[in-house]
């Protein structure tokens, strides 16, 4: 870091999720879009001077109560949403800034420069949790979250062992 307040910040969504080609995680973590919006809005509020905030996404998943209102407020407050997956990030030696390359919705190659890039990393179960589930005899889904019945979400395949929190699947607090 150069200890300077950035003038432009980019958030890259779905890092490590919704991607069976690179990481094998096909599921949506379901919280990252809203976290990125909140962080971008707070960053703009606390910035000294203008701050350009951009959220690069495959699509925005705002499916909770009033989340769509929050999304619309973010747009109104100047958060820019770009529907694309950034395919490369390079350091610009002359400034230390980051150059992002992506293909826009029209199919054109775009290059933009940012002072800070935030990776919105998908939620996943740790190796230790997978090992513990194995020792306890708790079956897991292919996503490695607890395999439970949608109508009995805390029950697991092992009687007396219950799932809670993100062991059930990605979720907001």
Report the location of each language-model feature.
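Residues forming the flavin
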Residues: 1-173
């Amino acid at each position: 870091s150069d200890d300077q307040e950035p003038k432009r910040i980019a958030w890259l969504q779905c890092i490590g999720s919704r991607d069976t080609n690179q990481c094998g995680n096909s599921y949506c973590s379901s919280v990252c879009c809203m976290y990125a919006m909140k962080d971008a809005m707070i960053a703009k509020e606390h910035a000294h001077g203008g701050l350009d905030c951009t959220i690069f996404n495959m699509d925005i998943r705002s499916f909770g109560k009033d989340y769509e209102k929050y999304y619309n407020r973010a747009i109104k407050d100047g958060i820019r949403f770009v529907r694309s997956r950034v395919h490369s990030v390079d350091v610009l030696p002359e400034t230390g800034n980051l150059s992002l390359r992506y293909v826009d919705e029209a199919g054109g190659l775009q290059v933009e420069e940012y002072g800070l890039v935030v990776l919105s990393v998908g939620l996943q179960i740790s190796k230790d949790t997978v090992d513990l589930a194995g020792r306890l005899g708790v079956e897991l889904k292919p996503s490695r979250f607890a395999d439970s019945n949608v109508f009995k979400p805390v029950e697991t395949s092992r009687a007396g062992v219950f799932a809670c929190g993100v062991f059930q699947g990605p979720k907001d607090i």
